[in-house]
Amino acid sequence: MTPAAIRPFAKADLEPSYGVWRRAWAAAVPSLDMDALEPGWRRQLPAEYLPARIVLAAECDRALAGFAIFDSARAWLDQLVVDPARHRAGIGRALMAAIRDIEAGPIEFRVMQANAGAIAFYERLGCVRLRPEASPTTGWPSWRYVWPAGRG
């Protein structure tokens, strides 16, 4: 497996990103109804995230392996998604390093409380759990985290 190349998300990444997103969320939280969630994501990614956020793609072996969505105006990580077939290959770390190159200060984000793998990943990076809160879009119980400046 070759290391991930991090680059700007391209239009050609849109369709493969839906599969990566679906596989990642289904693996992270098996109780989610992906058939119900996917149509909303297919609307949200091109309509909301792509025009207004920094979206980075991780490519391995000429295939999309993951992506990150970052709101630089708020120093907010919206999404970090890695194909479960590529977990533990350094892709999440590479995407986070690319985000850190954009924002040297603190970066905040939410993680679903049910997503134990993501929680462990972020805590290994030195992210700090701040408080519980519900996702404003889904109501899912989540943890608010910060990735302090200087970490990464």
Regions found by a protein language model. Give the residues of each.
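Conserved active-site alpha-helix within GNAT-family acetyltransferase domains
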Residues: 93-94, 114-143
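Acetyl-CoA-dependent GNAT
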Residues: 8-85, 96-98
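Short, flexible active-site-adjacent loop segments at beta-strand->alpha-helix junctions, enriched
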Residues: 24, 74, 86, 113-115, ...
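Conserved acetyl-CoA-binding loop-helix of GNAT-fold acetyltransferases
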Residues: 82, 88-101, 120-124
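Short aromatic/hydrophobic contact patches that present stacked aromatics
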Residues: 79-81, 108-110, 144
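Conserved GNAT acetyl-CoA-binding A-motif
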Residues: 102-114
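Conserved N-terminal entry element of GNAT/NAT acetyltransferase domains
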Residues: 1-12, 143, 148-152
